[in-house]
């Protein structure tokens, strides 16, 4: 973002220079460049050292460099127009206004980026809190499940013991009934024997 801001500052200065040159061309006089890039100044020094004897050649080189620089600026401005929201009034969409809008747009994007970072940090913190709560709940449910399984096992044991007791009681009742039947049969046989003796 800082590099973009520096580029915007350079473009602002270039736009002011271009507008000043256009105004001066309308009035018929020229001005001096407010700043020079290192590459352009080095090239101009080399061209001056080579062509002291031919001022026409240096002038054509200067024009070519100026044309190249303007084409580069135009290309950058066209790219900037595609990324910066502009006003509907086309008369106000000058190069200077475009660069100022770009600067405001960059500040707005930086603020949105900061807000997004804060929101992301807050959501991460909430996610960690929810995970710890979920782990606690899962641990509690596992304990409850183990307790319920233990109670089910103990209830099954008590049911089986109750069935054993009932079976023992039934066997005791059965043996008692069998004993009673055996004794009654014995009594009947005895009475028959006594009656036989009486008849005899």
From Swiss-Prot:
PROSITE patterns tied to this protein: BHLH
Primary location class: nucleus
Biased composition annotated in UniProt, kind: Basic and acidic residues: 136-146
Localization terms from the record: Nucleus
Gene3D superfamilies in UniProt: Helix-loop-helix DNA-binding domain
GO cellular component, one term: nucleus
Domain bHLH residue range list: 57-109
SMART domains: HLH
InterPro entries registered for this protein in UniProt: bHLH_dom, HLH_DNA-bd_sf
Gene Ontology molecular function, alphabetical: DNA-binding transcription factor activity, RNA polymerase II-specific; protein dimerization activity; RNA polymerase II cis-regulatory region sequence-specific DNA binding
Lineage top rank: taxon: Eukaryota
Span of the signal peptide: none
Pfam family, one: HLH
Keyword line: DNA-binding, Nucleus, Repressor, Transcription, Transcription regulation
Example of a GO biological process term: regulation of transcription by RNA polymerase II
Region feature (Disordered): 40-69, 136-165
SUPFAM superfamilies: HLH, helix-loop-helix DNA-binding domain
Subunit note: Efficient DNA binding requires dimerization with another bHLH protein. Binds DNA as a heterodimer with MAX.
Function: Transcriptional repressor. Binds with MAX to form a sequence-specific DNA-binding protein complex which recognizes the core sequence 5'-CAC[GA]TG-3'.
Protein name: Max dimerization protein 3
Species this protein is from: Danio rerio (Zebrafish)
Highest classification ranks of the organism: Eukaryota, Metazoa, Chordata, Craniata, Vertebrata
């Amino acid at each position: 973002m800082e590099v973009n801001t520096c580029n915007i500052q350079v473009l602002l200065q270039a736009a002011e220079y271009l507008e000043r040159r256009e105004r001066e061309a309308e009035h018929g006089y020229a001005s001096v460049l407010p700043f020079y890039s290192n590459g352009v100044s080095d090239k101009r020094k080399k061209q001056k050292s080579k062509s002291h004897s031919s001022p026409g050649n240096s002038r054509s080189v200067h024009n070519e460099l100026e044309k190249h620089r303007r084409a580069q600026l135009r290309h950058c401005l066209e790219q900037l127009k595609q990324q910066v929201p502009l006003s509907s009034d086309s008369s106000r969409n000058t190069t200077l206004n475009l660069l100022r809008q770009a600067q405001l747009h960059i500040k707005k994007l930086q603020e949105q980026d900061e807000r997004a970072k804060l929101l992301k940090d807050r959501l991460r913190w909430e996610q960690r809190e929810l995970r710890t709560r979920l782990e606690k709940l899962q641990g509690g449910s596992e304990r409850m499940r183990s307790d319920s399984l233990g109670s089910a096992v103990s209830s099954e044991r008590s049911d089986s013991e109750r069935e054993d007791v009932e079976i023992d009681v039934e066997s005791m009742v059965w043996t008692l009934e069998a004993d009673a039947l055996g004794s009654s049969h014995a009594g009947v046989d005895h009475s028959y024997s006594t009656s036989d003796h009486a008849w005899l």
